[in-house]
């Protein structure tokens, strides 16, 4: 083995070997165990959330594969309609083109080119992370098979009355010209205004105070043009007499009713609210309750129409409402119209006041434009009938959430579910399988030929396919079964569905998880007709945040590519990556500045195993992950520790009883074997409970502290003793090898590369013949090998040796200087342990002699260590240079007195305490406490040595 651990020298070659040998594919034996990779968007590269997700899934798959399950971990990518289309449109913009210049067909060719380039990048990253996915079964949400499955699902749901076309309110992105989902809307806290406007009462009506108008508060005066009512709370006594009467809409002159609705808060503004059902989601619900007309006043750009479009709630045209709008606002942008409308209201004496008001402004997460609630014709899935069985599946335990608290989030969403808008006004995506004749009649089918045959439409009937595409979440909602060959009843579908675990972030429980459950249970049935669930367990993890706890996003410029931590990256390359191809290029300068501050030298190379172990160690259930580069560095050191331990073992492993020779186990051998059994049981238990943090912690504790720090040291006296019995030396060598071999198997799901590299060399010494560690059996604890007596003896020894180390450090006694020991309160067990381990203590702790004192015996002035009730005394006389040590201590005491005075003065200065941030003050207080404690310790030592 190389002297130093170089991850890059081993990682790629091992991955290529595993893949070429087909080790990632199902091995054909055992009960199935399936995970479908949540398909990353084919829009560039994987981020830290994907890296975390992959580390968790691969740990599960490698663990279950070693347990003998027939594992399938299937990879793939998502076409990510809106995000991908935007990226390609931006590339065209740079060349002075747009998609309409190219036309739909040529534009889609460009997107496919981008997909091939980007998808290859994602596959490379997944490989580099060591993910043991079955590449022979890689899928893409728009490959031929999945496209057929999407059409099939749409047609079946339509035939079952669960998909319909309707005119409803959607989140409309006025820049991208498409409906977007709630997930793609970000609510920004902004300082805005509340306009208080006079709405004249019609027909001579008056308020209780005798006024002939109502004052209505609004944050969007431009939507006044589409008002359908003014609402008041039914219990608001000020307005009860006016319910059912009318106001005249300012600037427009249209009569609109005064209605009573609990939605109105009497404490907000004047208690009167304008209702614009076609441009506000809450108003739309009020409109439904009161059968109000829907008046659309904007076009797709959010420019004011010359006359409103009036509809009834069922989407039919309302011909009773006056749709005339003032000509001066026609074709004005909504925000330009706002200024004009407010000015006109003011001129007519209808503007009462403008108040400052904090509000949430919805913006498209990709375009950055203010989202407009807009009335359009869209396709919808009727979700309530699908939600009921999906709720029952979680209630009765067929699907379990880990941690369980996320079930409540799931239930609250599902019990208040709204119909799902599945159409998008894009070109990139699954085109909706619906056709229209020239009269506007719609026909749904798998293809045009089927539609013509089913509805007996001759060649003379001109059909036009719907231009819209399906929401990306629709195709990804079919992911667990469409990727296994559905609608064909393939062998893979029969064996590997339902899948076992879905690993996902909490932020898409509703958008993806719930929809997968609903669609799968409706479309996939068992032989007895009962619905299949898509997965048995949903493991929900938190978001991976940056070191400051901020969510990672391209717009914040804090996204890390996991491969940059694996392979390292220069500062210049990191800046280029973070600031190029941005949706909002104006943020580039700010992002460059913060990147230089955080990574002035770029990012060092840590290797895949260190990054994966970091992810697993941070995976406490359900909490957000604050990513810490310091942890990665620490686990890179852990890899070095394992590497160096393996080199020591290989150096000592020439005769370890692999051919059946006699051997004898020392106390230390029995102890480490016993500790190994406990570690095997603990790591297994925690992995089965999805506690990757506790599993990795148990493994780290065993390998670093027990095996490397203690057992390797305890093995040396046996192996270095030329007079030791051959059987005992062989027993220690055998234990060194076999415990390391098992520890490597335990660590393999977390750190696949380093464990494979070392295992290949260790396995033959342990008498194991196998091609790869990944197909070796998972270690199973043997309770018969737990040796409580050996554990007790070694813990006693460790306490004694640590006590002596501390005395050497405190008293500045060199590590090679032999120590005479006096022992007080030594019981029979203590004396037995001393006698049995005398040789070991003399070699490892450099103990010169032991003297057991009786109750009446007086010990010389000594430094003391406690091991239970046993007092271990190290006499100071003769061990230290008294004058030199006193001089050294005086120097330290003076330095600490100065530090205590300096920090104490700072903290007693009111000017400093009043101005400094709390964190700085806390740091200074901690520094003072530390210095005071150190001063007390050194003063005590000085007194003890002076008394010698």
Swiss-Prot record:
Which residues make up the binding site for ATP? 554
Q: Where is this motif: 'KMSKS' region?
A: 551-555
- Enzyme Commission designation: 6.1.1.9
Principal localisation: cytoplasm
What GO molecular functions are on record for this protein? aminoacyl-tRNA deacylase activity; ATP binding; valine-tRNA ligase activity
Domain of life of the organism encoding this protein: Bacteria
Cell compartment(s), UniProt: Cytoplasm
What class does this enzyme belong to in the EC scheme? ligase
Q: Which UniProt keywords apply?
A: Aminoacyl-tRNA synthetase, ATP-binding, Coiled coil, Cytoplasm, Ligase, Nucleotide-binding, Protein biosynthesis
Q: Where is this motif: 'HIGH' region?
A: 40-50
Q: Where are the transmembrane segments?
A: none
* SUPFAM superfamilies, per database record: Anticodon-binding domain of a subclass of class I aminoacyl-tRNA synthetases, Nucleotidylyl transferase, tRNA-binding arm, ValRS/IleRS/LeuRS editing domain
Which InterPro entries does this chain map to? Answer: aa-tRNA-synth_I_CS (IPR001412), aa-tRNA-synth_Ia (IPR002300), Anticodon_Ia_Val (IPR033705), M/V/L/I-tRNA-synth_anticd-bd (IPR013155), Rossmann-like_a/b/a_fold (IPR014729), tRNA-bd_arm (IPR010978), tRNAsynth_Ia_anticodon-bd (IPR009080), Val-tRNA_synth_C_sf (IPR037118)
Enumerate the Gene Ontology biological process terms.
valyl-tRNA aminoacylation
Recorded catalytic activity of this chain's protein: tRNA(Val) + L-valine + ATP = L-valyl-tRNA(Val) + AMP + diphosphate
Keyword DNA-binding among UniProt keywords = no
Question: How is the quaternary structure described?
Answer: Monomer.
Explain the purpose of this protein. Answer: Catalyzes the attachment of valine to tRNA(Val). As ValRS can inadvertently accommodate and process structurally similar amino acids such as threonine, to avoid such errors, it has a 'posttransfer' editing activity that hydrolyzes mischarged Thr-tRNA(Val) in a tRNA-dependent manner.
Give the comment on domains: ValRS has two distinct active sites: one for aminoacylation and one for editing. The misactivated threonine is translocated from the active site to the editing site. The C-terminal coiled-coil domain is crucial for aminoacylation activity.
By sequence similarity, the record places it as follows: Belongs to the class-I aminoacyl-tRNA synthetase family. ValS type 1 subfamily.
Record's protein name? Valine--tRNA ligase
Name the species this protein comes from.
Answer: Pseudomonas putida (strain ATCC 47054 / DSM 6125 / CFBP 8728 / NCIMB 11950 / KT2440)
């Amino acid at each position: 083995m190389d002297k130093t651990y170089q991850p890059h020298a081993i990682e790629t070659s091992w991955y290529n070997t595993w893949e070429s040998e087909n080790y990632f594919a199902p091995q054909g034996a055992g009960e199935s165990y399936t995970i479908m990779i949540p398909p990353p968007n084919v829009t560039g590269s994987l981020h830290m959330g994907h890296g975390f997700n992959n580390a968790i899934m691969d740990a599960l798959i490698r663990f279950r594969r070693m347990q003998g399950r027939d594992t399938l971990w299937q990879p793939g990518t998502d076409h990510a309609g809106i995000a991908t289309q935007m990226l390609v449109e931006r590339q065209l913009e740079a060349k002075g083109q747009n998609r309409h210049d190219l036309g739909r067909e040529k534009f889609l060719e460009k997107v496919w080119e981008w997909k091939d380039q980007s998808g290859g990048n994602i596959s490379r990253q997944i490989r580099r992370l060591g993910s043991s996915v079955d590449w022979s079964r890689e899928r893409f949400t728009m490959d031929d098979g999945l496209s057929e499955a999407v059409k099939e699902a749409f047609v079946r749901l339509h035939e079952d009355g669960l998909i319909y076309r309707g005119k409803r309110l959607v989140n409309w992105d006025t820049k991208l010209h498409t409906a977007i989902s709630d997930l793609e809307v970000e609510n920004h806290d902004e300082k805005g205004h509340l306009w208080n406007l006079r709405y004249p009462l019609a027909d001579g009506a008056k308020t209780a105070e005798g006024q002939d108008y109502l004052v209505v508060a609004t944050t969007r005066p431009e939507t006044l043009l589409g008002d359908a009512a003014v609402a008041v709370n039914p219990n608001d006594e000020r307005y009860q007499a006016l319910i059912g009467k009318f106001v005249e809409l300012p600037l427009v002159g249209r009569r609109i009713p005064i209605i009573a609705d609990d939605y109105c808060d009497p404490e907000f503004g004047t208690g009167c609210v304008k209702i614009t059902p076609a441009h506000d989601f809450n108003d739309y619900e009020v409109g439904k309750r009161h059968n109000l007309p829907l008046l659309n006043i904007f076009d797709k750009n959010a420019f004011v129409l010359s006359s409103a479009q009036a509809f009834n709630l069922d989407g039919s045209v309302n011909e009773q409402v006056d749709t005339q709008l003032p000509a001066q606002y026609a074709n004005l942008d909504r925000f330009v119209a706002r200024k004009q409308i407010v000015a006109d209201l003011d001129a007519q004496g209808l503007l009462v006041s403008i108040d400052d008001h904090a509000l949430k402004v919805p913006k498209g997460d990709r375009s950055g434009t203010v989202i407009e609630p807009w009335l359009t014709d869209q396709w919808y899935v009727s979700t309530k009938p699908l939600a009921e069985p999906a709720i029952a599946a979680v209630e009765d335990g067929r699907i379990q959430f880990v941690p369980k608290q996320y079930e409540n989030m799931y239930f609250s969403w599902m019990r208040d579910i709204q119909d799902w808008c599945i159409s998008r006004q894009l070109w990139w995506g699954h085109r909706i399988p619906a056709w229209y004749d020239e009269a506007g009649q719609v026909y749904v089918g798998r293809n045009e030929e089927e539609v013509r045959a089913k509805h007996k439409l001759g060649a003379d009937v001109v059909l036009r396919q719907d231009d819209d595409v399906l929401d990306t979440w629709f195709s990804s909602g079919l992911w667990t079964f469409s990727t296994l060959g559905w609608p064909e009843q393939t062998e893979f579908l029969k064996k590997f569905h339902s899948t076992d675990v879905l690993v996902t972030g909490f932020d898409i429980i509703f958008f993806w998880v719930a929809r997968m459950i609903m669609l799968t249970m409706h479309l996939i049935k068992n032989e007895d007709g009962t619905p299949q669930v898509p997965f048995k367990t949903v493991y929900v993890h938190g978001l991976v945040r940056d070191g400051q706890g901020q969510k990672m996003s391209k717009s914040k410029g804090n996204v890390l590519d996991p491969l940059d931590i694996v392979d390292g990256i220069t500062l210049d390359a990191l800046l280029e990556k973070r600031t190029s191809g941005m949706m909002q290029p104006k943020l580039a300068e700010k992002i460059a500045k913060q990147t230089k501050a955080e990574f002035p030298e770029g990012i060092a190379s840590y290797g895949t195993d260190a990054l994966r172990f970091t992810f697993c160690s941070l995976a406490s259930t359900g909490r957000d992950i604050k990513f810490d580069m310091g942890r990665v560095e620490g686990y890179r050191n852990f890899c070095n520790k394992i590497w160096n331990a393996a080199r020591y073992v290989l150096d000592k492993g020439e005769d370890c009883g692999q051919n059946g020779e006699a051997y004898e186990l020392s106390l230390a051998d029995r102890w480490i074997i016993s500790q190994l059994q406990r570690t095997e049981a603990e790591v297994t238990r925690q992995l089965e409970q999805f506690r990757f943090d506790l599993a990795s912690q148990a493994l780290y504790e065993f390998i670093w502290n027990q095996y490397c720090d203690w057992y390797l040291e305890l093995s040396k006296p046996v192996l270095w003793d030329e007079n030791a019995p051959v059987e005992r030396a062989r027993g220690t060598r055998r234990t060194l090898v076999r415990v390391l071999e098992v520890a490597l198997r335990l660590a393999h799901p977390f750190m696949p590369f380093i464990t494979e590299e070392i295992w290949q060399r260790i396995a033959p010494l342990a008498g194991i013949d196998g091609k790869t560690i990944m197909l070796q059996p998972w270690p199973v604890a043997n309770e018969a090998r737990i040796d409580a007596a050996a554990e007790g003896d070694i813990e006693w020894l460790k306490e004694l040796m640590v006590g002596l180390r501390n005395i050497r450090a405190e008293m500045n006694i060199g590590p090679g200087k032999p120590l005479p020991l006096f022992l007080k309160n030594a019981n029979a067990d203590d004396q037995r342990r001393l006698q049995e381990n005398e040789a070991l203590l003399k070699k490892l702790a450099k103990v010169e002699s032991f003297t057991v004192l009786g109750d009446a015996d007086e010990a010389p002035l000594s430094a003391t260590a406690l091991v239970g009730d046993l007092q271990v005394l190290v006499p100071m006389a003769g061990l230290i240079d008294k004058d030199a040590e006193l001089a050294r201590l005086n120097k330290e005491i003076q330095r600490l007195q100065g530090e205590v005075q300096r920090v104490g003065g700072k903290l007693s200065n009111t000017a400093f305490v009043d101005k400094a941030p709390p964190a700085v003050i806390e740091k200074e207080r901690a520094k003072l406490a530390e210095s005071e404690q150190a001063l007390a310790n050194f003063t005590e030592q000085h007194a003890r040595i002076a008394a010698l």
